[in-house]
């Protein structure tokens, strides 16, 4: 599949964005990927490539583009402490604007997914941008917390108006089992269409094949086909086999 890295300008700052393209002239459905704490790396690019192979334009914006080299060279988890939800929303929306300005994209068929911290961001974007027709968060924690001023993703759940598919590892502590129950209960109370899938023996980041300590192939091999089926149903109108 063809791919490239483009540069977008967001709030006066230059942001890299990886894009993977399916074959054919389109117009194609598209998916915006919110990356994990590792940043825009081989894992995220591979996920975009897989989506392109399934017929989607996939883009991954570099949400760390405001960070100094010192921050990026430090502990990975420390990067999250510098993130602000307002900046994340601006960056993700810049990726959406890139898509909607392209005639090869069907603006009525755009979804969002994310891994790790990107799972949280996928929820956040579903609650703040109605263009998304479906959302697939992978093991997104910290849903009940805000990054910078403003409401938490959890408190904005009423604003979500698209179906959601969640993937969790049964051994993951973030989100905790209690947090998952709370998320499920709130989405149910609000009448939001959602599916929760928990994978036995999997911990956090079980999709990340670049991390042997985290990767759980048995779970990943179930979660990814479910994801493609979900996108096909909601972005292509395809009938998903029972």
Regions found by a protein language model. Give the residues of each.
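Hydrophobic residues in well-ordered beta-strands that form the structural core
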Residues: 59-61, 137, 166, 196
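Active-site loop/turn elements of alpha/beta-hydrolase fold enzymes
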Residues: 56, 63, 140, 199-201
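Serine-hydrolase catalytic machinery in alpha/beta-hydrolase-like enzymes
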Residues: 5-105, 152-153, 206-211
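A short beta-to-alpha transition loop/helix N-cap that caps and shapes the active-site region
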Residues: 67-71, 142-147, 174
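C-terminal catalytic histidine-bearing segment of alpha/beta-hydrolase fold enzymes
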Residues: 188-242
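Conserved alpha/beta-hydrolase "acid-adjacent" motif
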Residues: 173-182
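Short beta-strand/loop motif that positions the catalytic acidic residue
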Residues: 160, 166-168
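Primarily recognizes the serine-hydrolase "nucleophile elbow" in alpha/beta-hydrolase
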Residues: 94-159
